[in-house]
Amino acid sequence: MNIIHVKNYEEMSQKAAALLFERIQQSPKITLGLATGGTPENTYTALIAKAKENGQSFSHVQTFNLDEYVGLPAEDKNSYRHYMEQRLFDHIDIPKEKTHLPNGMAPSLEEECRAYENMIADAGGIDIQLLGIGSNGHIGFNEPGTPFSSKTHVVELAEETRKANARYFPTLEDVPKQAITMGIQTIMEAKEILLLISGKAKAEAFAKLCSDEVTEAFPASILNKHPNVTVIADEEAASVYTQKAHL
C-alpha cells in the first residue's frame, strides 16, 4: 500500500480529488467506483471545482456506487442515489444512464445483485475504486465476517453501522436494516483503489489496517493483498498507528 499522510480532512479531500481528476483527464474512457457517507463529501466538492476550473467534461466517465439501502426509492432524500446526485452528479455533465447504483427497490434483490455484477463486468471492470473504512473495518457494507470471496449481495446492517448512519435519518428506527453492497471480491477486482481515512474515530481501524494481518474479522485487511492501493490518512486517523510505531 502507498500511504500518503496529510494534516487534516480538507487536505485529504484535496489530494483525493486531485488524484481522481488526473485519472479522469488522462483516460479517454474510465469507470469509477464511488462511495458515500461523510468521508468523501469534500472530495466530491473539490472534484467539481477542478472540473469547472479546467472545463473538464465527464461525458466519458461511467460510475458504479458501492452500495444502496434496501427499501428506499431513488428519490428518497436518504437514498445513496439522492446523495450522489446532490453531491456530484447534478454538478457535472455525466449522462444519468452512465451512473449506476444498486436498486434497493428491485422486486428480486438476488437478481438485482447478479445484474449489478454483470453491469460492472460489461463495463470492463472498475478502473479506480474510492473507499472509506468503518471503525470495525467494514468496506462498502461488508461487515466483519463477510467472506473475501463475496460478490454483490444483500446484507443485514450491523447495529454499529446503523447507529453511525443514524445522523442522516430522523431516528435510528428509520435507518434501513438491509442494503445491497458490492462484495469484497468485487471491490478487490478494481484495477486501483483509493482509500480515505480521516478522524480519531478511524484511528484504531487505520492501525489495524497497517498491522498487515489479513482476516475476514477485519474486512479492510484484504486491501493489503491488492497490488495498487493508495491510502490517504490525516493526522488524527494516523495517531494510534504513529504512537504504536514509536513504542
Curated annotation (Swiss-Prot):
Name the UniProt record assigns to this protein: Glucosamine-6-phosphate deaminase
Entry annotated with the keyword Metal-binding: no
Matching NCBIfam families: nagB
Domain of life (superkingdom): Bacteria
Presence of the UniProt keyword Hydrolase in the record: yes
Membership in a protein family: Belongs to the glucosamine/galactosamine-6-phosphate isomerase family. NagB subfamily.
Catalysed reaction equations from the record: alpha-D-glucosamine 6-phosphate + H2O = beta-D-fructose 6-phosphate + NH4(+)
GO-annotated cellular components: cytoplasm
Pfam families: Glucosamine_iso
PANTHER family membership: GLUCOSAMINE-6-PHOSPHATE ISOMERASE
Broad enzyme group: hydrolase
Keywords: Carbohydrate metabolism, Hydrolase
Pathway: Amino-sugar metabolism; N-acetylneuraminate degradation; D-fructose 6-phosphate from N-acetylneuraminate: step 5/5
GO MF term list: glucosamine-6-phosphate deaminase activity; identical protein binding
Organism: Shouchella clausii (strain KSM-K16)
Job description of the protein: Catalyzes the reversible isomerization-deamination of glucosamine 6-phosphate (GlcN6P) to form fructose 6-phosphate (Fru6P) and ammonium ion.
UniProt-listed GO biological process terms: carbohydrate metabolic process; glucosamine catabolic process; N-acetylglucosamine catabolic process; N-acetylneuraminate catabolic process
EC number: 3.5.99.6
Active site: 67, 136, 138, 143
